[in-house]
């Protein structure tokens, strides 16, 4: 009697993880799979059954079609491999090197520094219209003696935005 009470009983069944190791719990009704994995498995079985019923046939013509189809697939695979080989010519390599070289020259190599005081500015630098980079102290045109003519640029912008309209001269009667 003591033998029946001690360790002969199986432990109570708790939740089991999905058999596909997706991290969710499965149930016995869904073959120890979670609901998503079970739906996916049923969908794959349906698709396999549809494909098998569409491909299989009782006539011998379906077998001929299968053989022709597989032969065509083999031909397509072998043909698709041949055009994929590409020969590299030295002239094309030089063109690529020429294209890459200007991009590398455009990027500044060292840290960005203020033109006036040579202080490191990094991302907080201010680029002036004269083309130089300045720190927060020297960013104003009057502080760094900017060579850009703001007055002339403003006059040109106004002239473009507001063209002068002249009426034709009227003839006197």
From Swiss-Prot:
Binding site for Zn(2+) 3: 128, 130, 144, 146
Keywords: Metal-binding, Zinc, Zinc-finger
SUPFAM superfamilies in the record: AN1-like Zinc finger, Glucocorticoid receptor-like (DNA-binding domain)
Coiled-coil region list: none
Keyword Zinc-finger attributed: yes
Keyword Metal-binding: yes
Disulphide bond pairs: none
This protein's encoding gene: SAP2
General function of this protein: May be involved in environmental stress response.
Gene Ontology terms for molecular function: DNA binding; zinc ion binding
Residues annotated as binding Zn(2+) 2: 114, 117, 135, 138
Superkingdom to which the source organism belongs: Eukaryota
Chain ranges of zinc fingers (A20-type): 12-46
Descriptive protein name: Zinc finger A20 and AN1 domain-containing stress-associated protein 2
Zinc finger (AN1-type): 108-154
Binding site for Zn(2+) 1: 18, 22, 34, 37
Pfam family, one: zf-AN1
